[in-house]
Amino acid sequence: MDFRLNDEQELFVDGVRELMASENWEAYFAQCDRESKYPERFVKALADMEIDNLLIPEEHGGLNAGFVTVAAIWMELGRLGAPTYVLYQLPGGFNTVLREGTQEQIDKIMAFRGTGKQMWNSAITEPGAGSDVGSLQTTYTRKNGKVYLNGSKCFITSSAYTPYIVVMSRDAASPDKPIFTEWFVDMSKPGIKVTKLEKLGLRMDSCCEITFDNVELEEKDMFGREGNGFNRVKEEFDHERFLVALTNYGTAMCAFEDAARYANQRVQFGETIGRFQLIQEKFAHMAIKLNSMRNMLYETAWKSDNGLITSGDAAMCKYFCANAAFEVVDSAMQVLGGVGIAGEHRIARFWRDLRVDRVSGGSDEMQILTLGRAVLKQYR
């Protein structure tokens, strides 16, 4: 595989470097993390570079650049300290609506292009249905030409401020044979209650519990086809897990470089700590993990661009990168010592963020189960 970037990709990566050097973004990110605030100004700056157009088809005014280009940009953003986890909806969110939505839904979401604002997300997880998605209890009921949504969702990302949520629910009229359908819900409707939850990490993107009490919808609010909810989100899960893995790599690379610079200037016992063999061992292991992550990510991106990605690929990528990246950040924190745990160094934020990613977007355990099944299926 040729790892050299083409001219278009180089332009994007150069643009990212210029943006990150244009001001002290770290101070802004630290403030947003403390205040659990979405970094809209930063995302708007990326939108001005057309980052939100990367995967949109050319017939809709997009760049159709592909996931290899997304990978190159996300890796560089992460390496330079950007919280790329707030960008998960940018590369794929528009495409999903273009593919599944009605024209009215498409118009509502495409109006957010170029704004940097949060626009929509999926609501799937419930108090009694996390990894066991088939146990969802939120229902939709048809009555007098209307559709009524009832139930609760929890740990829903971006839901504090997004104007629209796509809600997975089951048909109340079919209790014995579950029919799962998604609904495009305007969050300003009566009967919706949103409760913000505090998180250990990933604090720049909200996490909420949402309750729906007889929320009135129209048939036109259906998202995609009736009964196709699971099939639709399966593809979304695969791409989400790939993007989580990209974020993990970028964050780990940033921590690695911070620790390397520190090791080359911190003096103890009359010499820089980077000359100590135990410190060198840490960097050797970190470098091996980072190189392995990078290779896996580019391979997965290439597979996605060529229609070859499987759930097993996404699970492997997500599991390996989430764990390897956390180990890299943990080792980098050990190198930084007191600076990393008692000061205001960004490594503490990275450590919190990456620990969350071993649960969010699919737990470690579910990735292993998915991957194990996928591997054995190849030999039946």
UniProtKB/Swiss-Prot annotation:
Classification via PANTHER family: ACYL-COA DEHYDROGENASE, ISOVALERYL-COA DEHYDROGENASE, MITOCHONDRIAL-RELATED
Organism: Proteus mirabilis (strain HI4320)
Domain of life (superkingdom): Bacteria
Biological processes, Gene Ontology terms: carnitine metabolic process
One Gene Ontology term, aspect cellular component: cytoplasm
Role: Catalyzes the reduction of crotonobetainyl-CoA to gamma-butyrobetainyl-CoA.
Protein name: Crotonobetainyl-CoA reductase
Name of the gene this protein is made from: caiA
Subcellular location: Cytoplasm
Cofactor(s) the record lists: FAD
Subunit structure: Homotetramer.
Main location class: cytoplasm
